[in-house]
């Protein structure tokens, strides 16, 4: 049993409609990403300061964080690609759910995001698909919500 949310995670996707996964969503497992490539990154929100003469800060506020989910998939013989793209652009809005290797640990759900892909090739890895999910404001709640399977 793990204490933290690490290891081989299960990454699943479904369609997002009106800012949330559709009705009772049917989550579809994505092929296992390349080792060490699945990551959720937060970018700190913009800091806004009210300055008085002399440059002293009277007040400050910060906008909300922005989030991005990234992962790389191998192109494998006999397997279909997870999404069709048009020169890197993947149509529609998507939702993602990540369940850690130890299902009792906390993962996350993203209700709404856009998805793009960058294709590359090296002789070491073959054809790789680098997916980038830009997280968008959901219908309700936080942009990245905690998720624990069975909870």
Residue ranges and their predicted role:
Residues 80-82, 119-120:
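A generic structural signal for short coil/turn motifs at secondary-structure boundaries
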Residues 1-75, 112-126:
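Solvent-exposed edge beta-strands and adjacent loop segments
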Residues 76-80, 139-140:
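Short, cysteine-centered beta-strand-loop-beta hairpins and adjacent loop/turn segments enriched
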Residues 81-107:
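Short, acidic/charged, Gly/Pro-enriched secondary-structure junctions
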Residues 51-52, 100-102, 138:
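Acidic surface patches and DE-rich sequence motifs
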